[in-house]
Every structure is written in structure tokens, then in C-alpha cells.
């Protein structure tokens, strides 16, 4: 999975992602955070899954490429459904997913 944002400030992108989550139930389970040069998406409910995206700055903004994922056993059957919801949040925040 790859994500492209027109912004060049990763912290501003995290803020947009959090704002896009709003009051959804998903906001209680999903956390976006920057650690060094990585965007870390943490999903916590009946276990913890983490997705690590390496951040590269390009002339078009920030590009995030999935570099590592750890999916909790309880999350595996729901991976597709949760991924779709996270993609919608990313798109609502102004990002493009490929």
C-alpha cells in the first residue's frame, strides 16, 4: 500500500488524519502517529496491529510506502474491511491510496 499527500509536513498530515476520523467508532480503535521517518498506524481492539509506512518527501508532497505490518490474529479475518475504512479516512484527509 502506498499513500500520497500533497502536504510536505508529516505532522500536519497526522493532524488531518485525526480530524478526518472525527467521532467515528473507528477513532477509538485506530491511531496515527509519526515516529522518526515513519507513519505508524496502530489498530487496538482484541489485540494490536501495526502498519509502518516509510515517509519520503517528493516535489508532490509526502509519499508513504508500507514497509512493515504486524496483524493481530483476531484482526486477520477483518483486515479487508478495516483497510477499506482506513483508506476512506485517508482520502477524506486529502490523501491518495494506491
Show which residues each predicted segment covers.
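Intrinsically disordered, low-complexity regulatory segments enriched in Ser/Thr/Pro
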Residues: 51-76
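Short, low-complexity, polar/charged sequence segments that are solvent-exposed and flexible
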Residues: 22-25, 51, 59-62, 82-86
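A generic beta-sheet turn/junction motif
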Residues: 34-36, 45-46, 57-59
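A conserved amphipathic terminal alpha-helix motif
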Residues: 72-98
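Negatively charged, low-complexity tracts enriched in Asp/Glu with abundant Ser/Thr
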Residues: 1-40
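Short flexible/disordered coil segments
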Residues: 30, 59-66, 89-98
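Amphipathic hydrophobic-ligand
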Residues: 46-50, 78-79
Amino acid at each position: 500500500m502506498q499513500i500520497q499527500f500533497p502536504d510536505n509536513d508529516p505532522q500536519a498530515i497526522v493532524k488531518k488524519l485525526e480530524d478526518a476520523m472525527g467521532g467515528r467508532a473507528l477513532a477509538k480503535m485506530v491511531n496515527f502517529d509519526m515516529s522518526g521517518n515513519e507513519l505508524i498506524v496502530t489498530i487496538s481492539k482484541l489485540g494490536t496491529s501495526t502498519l509502518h509506512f516509510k515517509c519520503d518527501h517528493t516535489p508532490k508532497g509526502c509519499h508513504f510506502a508500507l514497509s512493515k505490518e504486524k496483524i493481530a490474529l483476531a484482526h486477520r479475518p477483518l483486515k479487508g474491511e478495516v483497510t477499506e475504512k482506513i483508506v476512506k479516512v485517508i482520502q477524506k484527509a486529502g490523501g491518495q491510496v494506491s
